[in-house]
Amino acid sequence: MPDISQRGQEMPASPIRKLVPLANAAKERGVKVYHLNIGQPDIPTPQVGLDALKHIDRKTLEYSPSEGLLSLRRKLRDYYRRFNIDVEVDDIIVTTGGSEAVLFAFMATLDPGDEIIVPEPAYANYMAFAISAGAKIVPVRSSIETGFALPEIEEFEKLITPRTKGILICNPNNPTGYLYTQKEMNLLRDLVKKHDLFLYSDEVYREFCYTGAPYISAFHLEGIEEQVVLIDSVSKRYSECGIRVGALITKHKELKKNVIKFCQARLSPPLLGQIVAEASIDAPADYMLMTYNEYVERRKFLVDGLNRIPGCYSPIPMGAFYTVVSLPVDDADRFCQWCLSDFEYEGQTVFMAPASGFYTTPGLGKNEVRVAYVIEKEELGKALEVLRKALDAGIPTVLLDRDIAGLDVGRVMLDNERAG
């Protein structure tokens, strides 16, 4: 049998999705599963977006331009300017979700063996995209004790080598919910300017900043405009994860020219998704305010509840809709798997994302999980009670020697495939 690629073998399993087979099996057993593992908002999609989808009247669903519909790019330009992000239509490339924007940014700027410095924990798919580009993620550790603030800039300096091409941030942050301050952003600006690096800035959660301070984009940093590669997506702000529409924004003309080549190779971003996204930019202000206020309430409810559970600790996230929580367990991976495979409380269990998958450094995040507050407060309350009961119960000793990560997930996946 032919061998698969080294790249395929190195590709990490998603900490967000790898336990889905166990969750599906739990549901088959009649267990109610509270999904705190994935950033899939439950807020309704804006009606203007849904109406645009319903009223599509085309005889042919044709390719769009490789860089995206001009009308959408114009709308996006106007949207960014509301946040004092001064970009032109030609700076904006529409992508198949924010994920493709990250991938194309890496493919167009990195050669095999090049390095990107990333504060960890970080969005797990960054590692997958770096592997796809043949590049290397170099982690710089942030810690739960400081609320996952930006590591000291000297720690970044120590990691810079001749192969370093850029620094990647997510602001507000997934998975931690941290929001970088003006001072921290200025320090990053000075660093990338000093070493002539790219600053890749994933800003898909910009609407969800809870400090009251002005939102700071990488494009607000003077003197590095052509070094900024901004990543965006409509998925989170409009509850439109399924339409797969994002954007890569750059003022670097040579970079844009090369990104367009990758766009042409994949032909076209989703036509129907672009139509919905364009309409959704006109979502009324009260929709965005309702969404914002809902997440503010959920955040307080969840963090207060987590910190009342003995042994649990969550910092207060300042943005996005996630928090990273330390649990009183030795192995959060096993605990999360056990919650789905063997534990239930009154017919319910909880699905969380083990935080170790958001770290590049082996051994870090071993007792941490990422929790997304994307379900209603009533369900969050029930999920917190289930978590409390699961921690009280603990993984039975008889199960500790079982290879849940390998045998059980593999068995469940096979059983699901056989069941059709």
Predicted regions and their residues:
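PLP-dependent class I/II
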Residues: 2-4, 8, 12-14, 19, ...
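Glycine-rich loop-to-alpha-helix module at the N-terminal edge of alpha/beta enzyme cores
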Residues: 36, 59-62, 75-78, 82
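Short beta-strand to alpha-helix junction loop
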Residues: 66-68
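Generic detection of well-ordered alpha-helical segments
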Residues: 70, 74, 289, 293, ...
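Flexible loop/hinge segments that line or gate small-molecule binding clefts
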Residues: 390-419
